[in-house]
């Protein structure tokens, strides 16, 4: 696995002004590959190691979709921990701009450790990064990843499997609910190692009467063949 400094350097090389523009315009941004093929394979390999996880969810049981996901236990794998720590500061700067635009009273700490301290004071102490796995016919219903009162406005998904090689179908879906209008959808098909950064719950949207709160949900379209793995990185912890 790479060092934390290596992951931080890769993230620092991303075009953050372009990411910020895309997040403001559409509520999401897709990056070039951040993880290598071997790193993706190593993360997929962790899925069978039950000692790495605090919880396993059969999605069909709860009518969340068809598939399975597992929440990592503490301590997180070094790559996941490094990614979570390094991605947070630039996203916190954007998140605070969003909060100001929406005229909330929320200011997110500049570091992940600061956010997690806020979470822990509110009873949210469980790590939320997770691995998700779908086989042919699997899908994920539209949802939001909320685990308590503390909600960081942005999260990311890393795509570990090779599209058109390991699986087909399985687009990443985003739907924005607009006031007094029909919902707007996006279908995104990232390659292995790429990330999608997206709104967790709300985003500021410029409307005819000023800024309004656009509600966002995300999901996964049906996998038509093969096996699809992703890494989800949520920054707030869970109750």
Where are these regions (language model features)?
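Fe(II)/2-oxoglutarate oxygenase catalytic core
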Residues: 1-155, 160-239
């Amino acid at each position: 696995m790479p060092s934390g400094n290596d992951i931080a350097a890769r993230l620092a090389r991303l075009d953050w002004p372009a990411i910020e523009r895309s997040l403001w315009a559409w509520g999401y941004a897709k990056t070039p590959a951040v993880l290598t093929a071997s790193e993706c394979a190593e993360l997929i390999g962790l899925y069978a190691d039950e000692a790495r996880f605090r919880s396993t969810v059969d999605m069909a049981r709860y009518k969340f979709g068809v598939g399975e996901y597992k929440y990592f236990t503490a301590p997180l794998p070094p790559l996941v921990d490094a990614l979570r720590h390094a991605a947070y500061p630039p996203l916190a700067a954007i998140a605070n701009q969003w909060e100001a635009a929406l005229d909330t009273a929320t200011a997110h700490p500049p570091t992940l450790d600061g956010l997690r301290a806020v979470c822990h004071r509110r009873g949210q102490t469980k790590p939320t990064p997770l691995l998700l796995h779908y086989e042919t016919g699997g899908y994920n219903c539209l949802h939001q990843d909320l685990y308590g009162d503390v909600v960081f406005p942005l999260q990311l998904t890393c795509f570990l499997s090779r599209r058109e090689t390991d699986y087909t179908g399985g687009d990443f879906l985003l739907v924005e609910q607009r006031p007094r209008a029909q919902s707007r959808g996006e279908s995104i098909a990232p390659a292995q190692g790429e990330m999608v950064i997206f709104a967790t719950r709300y985003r500021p949207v410029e409307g005819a009467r000023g800024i309004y709160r656009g509600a966002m949900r995300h999901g996964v379209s049906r996998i038509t063949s093969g096996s699809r793995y992703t890494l989800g990185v949520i920054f707030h912890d869970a109750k």
